[in-house]
């Protein structure tokens, strides 16, 4: 199970699972419900089933990520520390990469200001990890970080020059590359230069389409199209995506949704089909 971040509000009401009402809720509703890792996962060095691309809310009032490391201590074995918020692992022929986009700056709320490590160092590390995957004949890479590469709503996309799309897209000819983002509270999807982008901000927080002024933002006429709402204004929706990965086959994405305003509130939809 992968999260693109912001699973809590802040650390100002307690840091660890034993203190924070937010981490207690994550623990009770998600982590405790998951079965222990099986032998295949343990052999791959994975001692849990839930992995997060750390968002700005995880460090708000908790700069040393005590909450994250108390809830999912096995991330330490993948290299996560208060000074390093990025990591990677391989599982059944897929390379998983998790980056750190930043702590939030109200003056530019999607600016990649991550400093553990800084943007340039993260890009160098991602390039090394993707080169390594390519050399090992890994054909699929899933990259997760909080701020969105492409976005038409809410807080908007990562601004240039620190938007990683061009670097990520340079690997699309060699492997299937999928990027999972969050931060903005709605759902959008893009297929740009061979890279599939899923902005999955419908995990539970109040949705931008019901917040004044956040339903949409101005973008250029040639901005990539959102393939989810397909030009229609986004609406309130809560969802998660199941990703079916099989060797040497096209990855399948199935979104399961809840629309509280709809006469048919529950539904599923195949993405990128």
Q: Where is each model-derived feature located?
A:
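Active-site beta-strand/loop signature of hydrolases that rely on acidic residues for catalysis
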Residues: 1-12, 55, 142-146
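A short, hydrophobic/aromatic-rich structural module that often spans a beta strand
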Residues: 60-61, 113, 151-158, 197, ...
């Amino acid at each position: 199970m992968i999260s693109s971040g912001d699973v809590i509000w802040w650390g100002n009401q307690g840091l660890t699972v034993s203190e924070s009402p937010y981490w207690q809720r994550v623990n009770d509703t998600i982590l405790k419900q998951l079965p222990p890792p099986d032998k295949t996962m343990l052999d791959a060095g994975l001692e849990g089933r839930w992995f997060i691309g750390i968002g700005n809310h995880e460090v708000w009032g908790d700069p040393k990520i005590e909450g994250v490391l108390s809830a999912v201590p096995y991330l330490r074995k993948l290299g996560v520390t208060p000074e390093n918020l990025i990591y990677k692992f391989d599982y059944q022929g897929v390379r998983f990469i998790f980056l750190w986009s930043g702590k939030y700056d109200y003056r530019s709320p999607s600016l990649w200001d991550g400093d553990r490590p800084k943007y340039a160092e993260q890009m160098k590390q991602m390039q090394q990890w993707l080169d390594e995957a390519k050399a090992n004949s890994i054909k699929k890479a899933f990259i997760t970080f909080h701020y969105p590469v492409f976005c038409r709503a809410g807080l908007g996309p990562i601004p240039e020059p620190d938007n990683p799309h061009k670097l990520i897209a340079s690997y699309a000819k060699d492997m299937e590359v999928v990027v999972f983002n969050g931060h903005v509270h709605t759902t959008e999807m893009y297929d740009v230069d061979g890279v599939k982008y899923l902005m999955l901000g419908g995990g539970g927080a109040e949705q931008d389409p019901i917040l004044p002024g956040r339903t949409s933002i101005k973008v250029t006429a040639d901005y990539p199209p959102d393939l989810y709402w397909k030009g229609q204004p986004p609406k309130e929706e809560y969802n998660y995506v199941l990703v079916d990965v099989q060797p040497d086959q096209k990855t399948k994405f199935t979104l399961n949704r809840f629309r509280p305003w709809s006469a048919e509130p529950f539904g599923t939809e195949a993405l990128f089909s």
